[in-house]
Amino acid sequence: MELKKSPDGGWGWVIVFVSFFTQFLCYGSPLAVGVLYIEWLDAFGEGKGKTAWVGSLASGVGLLASPVCSLCVSSFGARPVTIFSGFMVAGGLMLSSFAPNIYFLFFSYGIVVGLGCGLLYTATVTITCLYFDDRRGLALGLISTGSSVGLFIYAALQRMLVEFYGLDGCLLIVGALALNILACGSLMRPLQSSDCPLPKKIAPEDLPDKYSIYNEKGKNLEENINILEKSYSSEEKCRTTLANGDWKQDSLLHKNPTVTHTKEPETYKKKVAEQTYFCKQLAKRKWQLYKNYCGETVALFKNKVFSALFIAILLFDIGGFPPSLLMEDVARSSNVKEEEFIMPLISIIGIMTAVGKLLLGILADFKWINTLYLYVATLIIMGLALCAIPFAKSYVTLALLSGILGFLTGNWSIFPYVTTKTVGIEKLAHAYGILMFFAGLGNSLGPPIVGWFYDWTQTYEIAFYFSGFCVLLGGFILLLAALPSWDTCNKQLPKPAPTTFLYKVASNV
């Protein structure tokens, strides 16, 4: 169905509002899971590493399943996926209130809620991109702050609900709030031409002659497949001879579709043999597409900046994600009294993440700022801030570090810019999908690793030194790969003839 031109406004602003609210509702609880993490530790008595799997799965599963989420949205549309995912998120949260043990939470909260969030994120971003072209950056920036605002509000909301209604009541109420996603999804009107008539089914006898005849030698493979997919609507008569039971096909002659079907078994065998041949060609084509995908993936990793970027995003999520999950428990382990809490530390991380997304996004638009180096700077500063957490023994210092970490976590808003500069716009979708997979892997592994360090040492010191080292290492690897001096050194060495699979982008970022 033909789509309208992106209106860059109008109903698009309704899409922005409901997408913002959708991300607010679905990501509020998973991102503020640190409040629930403390309650689960007390309720189930499991180790910190095992309990941390609940929150890490909720954040990582959606990213790990990003290719499946994209396929669902492209196949069914943003509105149905949003409504279905709203049921998943709400149902997973409500189901978690009846969890008898931590393993049940792995499924109900970690997998069900996490997968629902991944589907919702893909749906909101996709439909926003359809409605906006010139103002796409602004629209995406606005909806992306929904998750950060959700983190800010849900951290305080969940703490209050736990105090008044207990852990189970909190999850039931938060799940009920998530049902509002269904209303948001109903407003996600598909962008399609209102005056575009629905396609009519054509009777076989009314098909044009060009679909009744097929000359194998005059068509390329893609045309063969297209005609095969339209299927045959009429009998074809072949000039062939039967020799030793094998058919030797020269060409196909057109036969009027109104002619009655022949009863000769030879014609039936010819048709079966012909369609079998084209099915084999279709299978070969699909295999060729798979080989091309693998070849493009290998080509991406031949780009040293992209290879460094994938290592950096993996290490960043292993080390940078745990604070949003564990900071409340860090304060409790540092003997910070609850009376000193002016605002939950997770709320500070959330509001500063929203500020960081906006300010870093604005800085990335300045031509005199190198986006890749800006991203590297956020990684290095974040690594240093993580290493400073063990020295924070008061609410004020923990709040200050939480604000710094939250602001730097806003570098997610410039990550697509960095990816585009690294591989080019034509490779963005492929490259971004790979990077998001490794980001999900890091999100899933980071908090349990930090929790295991605590279970091993009974202190968060080594755990956050490890987190800071991971982020620092990722930043320095990316910095070294992007330095123009590396290209200068490589130019002095004999190099093979350039191919389409080699990219020199570091000096152009």
From Swiss-Prot:
Identification of the protein by name: Monocarboxylate transporter 9
The GO biological-process annotations, alphabetized, read as: carnitine transmembrane transport; creatine transmembrane transport
Q: Which SUPFAM superfamilies match?
A: MFS general substrate transporter
- What family, per the record? Belongs to the major facilitator superfamily. Monocarboxylate porter (TC 2.A.1.13) family.
Catalysed reaction, written as an equation: creatine(in) = creatine(out); (R)-carnitine(in) = (R)-carnitine(out)
Q: How does it sit in the membrane?
A: Multi-pass membrane protein
Cytoplasm found in the keyword field: no
Pfam families, per the entry:
MFS_1 (PF07690)
Q: Fetch the CDD domains from UniProt.
A: MFS_MCT9
Give the transmembrane region(s).
Answer: 13-33, 53-73, 80-100, 102-122, 137-157, 164-184, 305-325, 342-362, 372-392, 398-418, 433-453, 462-482
Q: Which gene encodes it?
A: SLC16A9
Cytoplasmic side of the membrane: what ranges? 1-12, 483-509
Question: What would be an example GO MF term here?
Answer: monocarboxylic acid transmembrane transporter activity
State what this protein does.
Extracellular pH-and Na(+)-sensitive low-affinity creatine transporter. Also functions as a pH-independent carnitine efflux transporter.
In which compartments does the protein localize?
A: Cell membrane
Keyword annotations of the record: Cell membrane, Membrane, Symport, Transmembrane, Transmembrane helix, Transport
Q: Does the keyword Membrane apply?
A: yes
Highest taxon of the source? Eukaryota
One GO cellular component term of this record is:
plasma membrane
| InterPro entries for the chain | MCT9, MFS, MFS_dom, MFS_trans_sf, Proton-linked_MCT
